[in-house]
Amino acid sequence: MDIPDQVLNIARVVRDEGGRALLVGGCVRDELMDKQPKDWDVEVYGIQPPQLREILDQFGSVNVVGEAFTVYKLGAHLDVSLPRRERKAGRGHRAFVIEGDPMMSVADATKRRDFTINAILKDPLTAEIIDPFQGRTDLAAKNLRAVSPETFAEDSLRVLRAAQFAARFEFEIEPLTVELCRPIDLSDLPAERIWGEMEKLLLRAQCPSIGLDWLRKLAVLPQLFPELEALIDVPQEVEWHPEGDVWIHTLLTVDRARESIDDLPYPKQVTVMLAALCHDFGKPATTAFVDGRIRSREHEEGGVRPTIDFLDRLNIYTLDGYDVRAQVIALVRDHLKPGEFYKKRDEVGDGALRRLARKCELDLLYRVAKADSLGRNAEWVPREKWYNAEAQDWFIERARELDVAASAPSPILFGRHLLEMGMQPGPRIGEITKAIYEMQLDGRVTSLDEARAEAKKILSADYADSADGNEIPNARDLSH
């Protein structure tokens, strides 16, 4: 592990002042898992808060966070704190009375941590590992275990953390910890904390399905995600979905989607993963036996309302200026379109793809639809029977040929062009620009000159239909 010089220098000064600075939590865990940490947490023993602040001020700007208990942030990736005592003081995962106590023992300080793998400390100067709860043993066994059965349930967020750690590290949650999690009331958790753990589960895990199925096993779904709970045991036609029910299909789809997003910016990664997770939310309400077969007709449209409810619960709107919410809803509504277009590929005109690009980003739709198509890999079904994305590959190639994979075409004709032609401001300008844009989507207008020519035809028709000619501001309209 490459420990930053800033951390080493702080540890040296703390040592010289009679204290001890120890790395703790995720950075130690990551090193033991052969991962380079991105964030660093340092716990300082034997130094009182005023003296610690004086020490830290030597190493740059210090941002003090917390009222009852102080965390000193030095930049985006280094937190320094004192060991602390916590006492539950009410309902809610943040309802604790917290007191910093630099004289605590390491064993007492680490009792408050969630899992044994996060309760390992390291001296950055001597490389000594301090492991009071056998976290290294659990790391080696790929086991997630609660540090303290007595206090684990005091922080309800730990249930979601258990699922996301299990997904990210592909660990098992040991049985006692499962039993600790299942009865915990999660209604105190705010949306931003729920999403914080779900975001890690969906984006940081290579197989998010592991974490999602742990949410089921830990009894989280009926409390927080009834839309996901509703997918369990919803049947599917074996010919199309040999993998099993809609829940199993959703887990497989999410894993296939996760494989497709590493080249995307963060907001679009979130969009694809949420759309993959929500894409069949309409099936519980639409699935029925029709002519002896299981059908889920119009489940795409039927999934819009539960998707909105799901996004509302997580408070998902825009991320970094990107309208994740609108895109997810559109992707759910249109996730079958690539396959439908492929089936009618000899009839589908360019305008259909251009118009679809106005509703959602076709590159993202391709990824969601492909994940949906490939999310059918039952172990007993030969690969060639399910690994087929011919329709989706055709769809994205055609979208790229039309240059609409990322966005719909920008309009060629704007209102200012009509004003330049002599029209007076008014609602007719919007009507004409819209009509010309529809021609553009159909490929009938490809340049500004052609757009102006078509606009003149519309204006001429307006003039001819007008008894007194007042709809045309002046004759100059037709001469430009």
Question: Could you tell me what each predicted segment is?
Answer:
Residues 1-463, 468-470, 477-480:
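Catalytic cores of the polymerase beta-like nucleotidyltransferase superfamily
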